[in-house]
Amino acid sequence: MIPLSVPNINGNEWQYVKDCLDTGWISSAGAYVNKFEEAIQNYTGVKYAIACMNGTAGLQVSLNLAGVSSDDIVIAPNLTFVATLNAISYSGAQIALIDVCEDSWQMDIDLLQNWLANNTT
């Protein structure tokens, strides 16, 4: 088997995992989730921060809070993880895929500008 990624566990991680298992808080709540949310609040200076179970859930929450619905088109790079497109699809919006630059693998700004010029008013 070729591993997708090799875990890098050092420092206090073993103790943190043991704490979670000992307390029974191994999912979406508990002291470490609260500490993480507070740290994000302090770091970003926002009033609220919510930890999500995965990136897909975070994207879905973000799209929902932005008011994205079936009347919208969401632009995304064509080179992305499937969760990006799944979250957009779940919102009901249409997806417009824009190709990426060969040298950076980021969305090609020229193609984006062309798409916007031809598809928006």
Give the residues covered by each predicted segment.
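N-terminal "arm"/small-domain region of PLP-dependent enzymes with the aminotransferase-like
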Residues: 1-26
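Active-site loop/turn elements of alpha/beta-hydrolase fold enzymes
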Residues: 79, 93, 100-102
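Conserved coil-to-alpha-helix start sites within the AMP-binding
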Residues: 80-85
